[in-house]
Amino acid sequence: MNGDHTNKAASDGGGLATRIGRLQTSNYDISNVCNLRCEGCLYFSGAGLEVGKSENDIEVWEKFFLSEAQRGVTFAYLGGAEPSLTPDRIRACHEQIPMGTIFTNGTKKIESDIRYRIHVSLWGNEDSSELYRGANVNRKAMLNYKGDPRAVFVMTLNALNLDEIPDVARACQDHGLPLVFSLFSPTLDYNKRMSGTRHEDSDYFRFSSGQSDMRFGEDMLHRARDAIFDAASRFPKTIRISPAFINWVTRQESLYTLDERGVAIDCGNRLTRRHVHFNADLTRNSEKCCAPNLDCRDCRPYAMSLATYFSRRRQMPDDWEGVWQYWREIFGPLPEDEKALEDSSEMTT
């Protein structure tokens, strides 16, 4: 998620940047291995040779994150295949970069002294998790993070699982876990397979067909919006939403203007000189954004979409500050950690 736009919001809305310093973000794929096989995985589905290599020397990682801190990075987005499988790399980042978010499937608990926010992905209820991901890991993830203030559970909605939202919300409620929503966004590979132009076997395309299509077709985005609002009214202490953002991200038309290659020209998550995406072998990714396998036409994941929303804040003068507060609630440091960061910022100024 491009910090150029997040940082502007931090300065203008709520004063977070004033208290803890400038937010400068970058994305790091710290792992190229995973213990699940999610249908249409945004990391592996259609990936190139870059996912086949990884830097395994922890001293190299430690020096790398030190150099990133010296470059001015203050907020790390840690992802890849499954970052919790490389806890030493998480720690190496945490020792140098003060804030961050880890995107994980929750099957391996991240140690409690790592004070980054932890976003745990869910793809459906107990019954369907194995279909979507190759294993039913919901309960394990929820037990790992029960009552953990760092954790935010993220249900990826698709055209097939909207009726499962109440089950997931109830399970999160029972485990003291907040729930937010993302929208399934097909990779270029997924779209090619659904159109019949790619046929080779893939661990990340197992059950999808014309009768089992996870993509949001006509009117399905409106159904997703209504399902989110209905669930939020039923589980107000568990579900966290920004109504303005939900209304925007579920609008029927594409969120983006595309160039002749099908690449979004008005995406708030494009890589820049400062906002960089590194692969697991520590090479600098030269693609369009931190999720280059996604088809820009249908791109609606929550983190990337929030960056784009902030980049268009002049188009939403009455709403963007509330959306920024939503970002801060789910991505920003916890109140007790924010105070420590504020004290640290004062000591270095």
Task: Label the model's feature ranges.
Residues 1-112:
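Conserved alpha-helical substructure of the radical SAM core
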Residues 2, 8-17, 22, 267-349:
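Flexible mid-to-C-terminal extensions adjoining Fe-S/redox cofactors in radical SAM and related proteins
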Residues 28, 32-35, 261, 290-293:
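Processing junctions and N-termini across compartments
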Residues 48-63, 80-140, 155-167, 183-193:
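Canonical radical SAM enzyme core domain
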Residues 70-74, 94-100, 108-117, 146-151, ...:
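Short glycine/proline-enriched coil/turn segments at helix->beta-strand junctions
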Residues 121, 127-261, 265-266, 278-281:
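Radical SAM enzyme [4Fe-4S]-AdoMet core and its adjacent flexible, acidic
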